[in-house]
């Protein structure tokens, strides 16, 4: 006689933990985000997470297939938080810009989590909602599907790549980050014009600029490219 398949919800813990809370995916992800902030990715283990939640570590596997599955859920949560803060206006450029900045900001709010999750594809509902939204904006702007997919990839990869890059800097110790930032004054600004004329000429500008993320600038460049493609398509249509 075949074994009865137990529904997923029935496998999950309904009794309160030692901390007096009833576990859920959301609660576990929130605890994981706190743990990443305090201990970094090396400190995120099932044992430590279980202890923080007042539950046996094995209980976590009722909710997630493993720590890799949890990492995907963390990325999904960060995606969802960005979408929750975003409001559509109907202007494709404004909507893409604010959504891109919201995604970047959501990941930077949790640098250790961003380093862990920015490169992952979760396939979870909130990530899917973000992807559907981006494609909807691009197609709604008038791009044909091949161009919409091309710019979708450029848009989401740009947001996540800069999220990972900028989060990596924020995840450094304060001492290491300060040393890196001071390098523009302590080293670059002192290079002689005889050997490094271009750096010497722009050293002060570099020192001021390199303390900021390039993401907004590059995002605007991408949006300019989308606008140019839409304009070219419109011109061809009127010929």
For the regions a language model picked out, list residue spans one by one.
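Amphipathic alpha-helical segments used for helix-helix packing
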Residues: 75, 104-126, 132-133, 164-171, ...
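Hydrophobic alpha-helical connector segments
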Residues: 84-126, 145-148, 152-155
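N-terminal intrinsically disordered/low-complexity leader segments
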Residues: 1-23, 195-208, 234-239
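Short hydrophobic/aromatic patch on the recognition helix
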Residues: 54-64
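Basic, helix-initiating cap at the start of DNA-binding domains
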Residues: 1-52, 65-72
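Alpha-helical structural segments
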Residues: 26-34, 38-39, 69-85, 94-102, ...
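Hydrophobic alpha-helical bundle segments that form small-molecule/ligand-binding pockets
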Residues: 130-185, 207-208, 226-230
């Amino acid at each position: 006689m075949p074994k009865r398949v137990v529904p997923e919800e029935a496998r999950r813990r309904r009794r309160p933990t030692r901390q007096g809370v009833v576990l859920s995916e959301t609660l576990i992800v929130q605890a994981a985000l706190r743990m990443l902030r305090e201990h970094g990715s090396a400190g995120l283990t099932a044992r430590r997470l279980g202890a923080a939640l007042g539950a046996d570590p094995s209980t976590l596997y009722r909710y997630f297939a493993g720590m890799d599955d949890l990492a995907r859920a963390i990325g999904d949560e960060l995606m969802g938080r960005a979408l929750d803060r975003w409001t559509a206006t109907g202007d494709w450029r404004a909507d893409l810009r604010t959504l891109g900045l919201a995604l970047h900001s959501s990941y930077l709010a949790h640098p250790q989590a961003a380093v862990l999750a920015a490169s992952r594809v979760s396939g979870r509902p909130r990530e899917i909602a973000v992807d559907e939204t981006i494609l909807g904006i691009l197609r709604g702007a008038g791009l044909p599907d091949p161009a919409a997919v091309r710019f979708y990839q450029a848009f989401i990869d740009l947001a996540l790549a800069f999220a990972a890059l900028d989060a990596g800097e924020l995840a450094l110790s304060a001492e290491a980050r300060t040393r890196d930032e001071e390098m523009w004054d302590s080293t670059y600004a002192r290079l002689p014009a005889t050997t490094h004329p271009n750096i010497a000429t722009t050293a002060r500008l570099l020192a001021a600029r390199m303390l900021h993320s390039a993401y907004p600038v590059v995002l605007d460049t991408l949006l300019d490219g989308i606008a140019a493609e839409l304009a070219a398509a419109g011109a061809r249509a009127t010929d």
